[in-house]
Amino acid sequence: MTIKQLHESDRPREKMIRLGARCLTDAELLAILIGSGNDRQTAIQLAQEILAKMDNSLPRLAKCDIQELTGSFRGMGPAKAVTVMAAMELSRRIPSQEMPRRESITDSRMAYRTISPFLTDLPQEEMWVLLLNQSGKIISMENLSRGGVSETSADVRLIMHKAVSHLASAIILAHNHPSGTVRPSEQDIQLTQRVQKAATLLGFRLNDHLIIGDDGAYFSFADEGLL
């Protein structure tokens, strides 16, 4: 059975137009993104299979990459996978835009709220820097690297260059641990110390270094008295 063979009231697109997005199940919303199923399943059935394999967890789905989706599910080609990943990325960015960019970052919680949408539910490790003016307001947020702190730790000069080129008075580092744990590694500690030393020499501050984990957990070097 195809979606077109379903009663109109049960078709996800028509149901969304009639009742609104909130009345649809996760599988129905995902089916709209997928668009079509395969020779054995409707789009809804394919969406249900995908969610079941993800333990019905949208954060788990958000951690997938295109290769995982296309390689694990019949009928999921690159175009469908890209559409799903694009929707996941848009939802990830919403919280960061709800906080005014000109609001001063005064504590670790505000810094976390600003940067976490870019570092949550990622399959790989990434390092970002928040560049702040004298009032603690964001000048820019920059992605420094993807792949791990071991690679990033060699890029202290890049961090300093970005701070100087943006005339920043302070910076906040942030990276994620895909494992979900927020305990700093020895590499994390060494990188923080190197950046703090370099920042002091150049006349600006390292206000914090955040490690982003799962379920809203984070570690703040500033809160723990490590700066």
From Swiss-Prot:
The keyword Protein biosynthesis does not apply. Keywords: Hydrolase, Metal-binding, Metalloprotease, Protease, Zinc. A motif (JAMM motif) lies at residues 175-188. Gene3D superfamilies: Cytidine Deaminase, domain 2 (3.40.140.10). One of its GO terms (molecular function) is metallopeptidase activity. InterPro entries: MPN (IPR037518), RadC_JAB (IPR025657), UPF0758 (IPR001405), UPF0758_CS (IPR020891), UPF0758_N (IPR046778). GO terms for biological process: proteolysis. It comes from the Bacteria. It holds the Pfam family UPF0758_N. CDD domains: MPN_DUF2466. Zn(2+) binds at H175, H177, D188. PANTHER family: DNA REPAIR PROTEIN RADC, UPF0758 PROTEIN YEES-RELATED. Belongs to the UPF0758 family. This is UPF0758 protein PG_0894. It comes from Porphyromonas gingivalis (strain ATCC BAA-308 / W83).
